[in-house]
Amino acid sequence: PFWALLLASNLADFVWLALALAGPEAPVPSSLLDASLRGLRVNMPYSHNLLPTFALALVTAGAAGAIWRDARGALWCGGLVLIHLACDLVSGFEHQILGERSAPIGLDLYRRSPHLALVIEAAFGAACVLWFSRRGAVPRRRLIALYAVFVGGALLWLPTATIPLGRLFGLRG
C-alpha cells in the first residue's frame, strides 16, 4: 500500500522521534522553539547510523513481506529505509558508521549549509513525485497533495534553517 511506502521512507525519523522523547537520542536544544537546523545538535546512533539503518531496513522488508506477501513491495519498503539514509548523508546531519566513536559520514549540510540542504530536499521531493506520477494515472488532488507535502514541506523549514522557531514567532528573545 502507498501509505506503507510513505511510512518506510520516514521510519528512521519516527524511530528517532521516539528515542529523542525517551532520552537516548535527545537533541540539544531540547525545545523545538529554541532550535534552528544549524544550531541543532543530534546524536542518532540507533536510528540513523549506517549499520543500525541496514538492520532497520531488513526488519522493515521482512515485516512488509510477512504482512502483504509481496516480495517486490517488501523490497521497496526496505529500500526506502536505505534511501532515507542516503538522502540524509547528502542533505542531513552527520552520521556515523556504528556509534559515536566510529568514523563520521555524510556532508552534514543541516549544520554547514542548512538552506542548501532544504532546497536539495525539496528538489529530491519534486523529482520523486514527478517519477511517481509518470508511472501511472495520479488524481490531480493527490498530485497537489504530494507536491505540497514533499516540496512545500521541505521549503516550509527554510526560515528555521538559521533562526530558531521561537524567535521567528516572537516567543523567545
Model-flagged regions — what are they?
Residues 1-173:
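N-terminal membrane-targeting hydrophobic helices
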